[in-house]
Amino acid sequence: MKIWFLLFTTMVVALYAYEPLDSTDKKLEAEFEKHKVKEVYKGEIKIPNSYKKDEEGLYRDKFGKFVSNQQDFYVNFAGKYMIVTHSCGTSCYYRTVEDLSAGKSVKIEGMDKFDNTETRPLFKDSEMGGFAKLYTREDSDLLMARYVNFDTDVCKQEYFVLKTLKNGKKKLKRISKRTPCDTPIE
């Protein structure tokens, strides 16, 4: 059982971990710079109560499911948020956004488009499915999503920015079309 858990954990971390972009991608770095937030939260990280450490010291969500980020809570998006990937079974995952300055989950309209669940598959025409890898920076409200289809190895990408609506709700606004990966943003 432990071997399966370690294998699954390794796969999830490899596929869904948020990693910094290659610094040679100057155009994308410039785009992140265009969408800088006013301030990055540097205070005490407040982990929402819905996360608990198990006997092995790994974070699990309120359903007891493994949380696939690097098992450390840190700001990785738009100044005070962390995007967290949750396991819901084999090749099944969904994401939540946590406000680490307040220790609470935040509903962001459009975030579920990056999920891969039974009721909302990322690739409806794919037998094997795929995954969406998200690229973010702590000091920017820009989010780049790359979608990889396991059946075809086709990679597509698109860009979004986090917007706060007049009613106070948050929404991801798409600012590009879905294009082949490594296409510079226009």
Regions found by a protein language model. Give the residues of each.
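Sec-dependent N-terminal signal peptides
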Residues: 4-13
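Surface-exposed loop and turn segments in beta-propeller and other repeat-based domains
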Residues: 110-124, 182-183
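Acidic, small-residue rich beta-repeat scaffolds with periodic aromatic anchors
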Residues: 4, 17-52, 129-186
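Extracellular/luminal recognition modules and glycoprotein regions
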Residues: 53-71, 76-77
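Signature of short aromatic-glycine-proline-rich micro-motifs recurring in repeat-based ectodomains
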Residues: 62-63, 67-69, 124-135
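Short consensus segments that form the blades of beta-propeller domains
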Residues: 85-89, 123, 150-153
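Mid-length scaffold segments of soluble, non-membrane domains
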Residues: 73-111
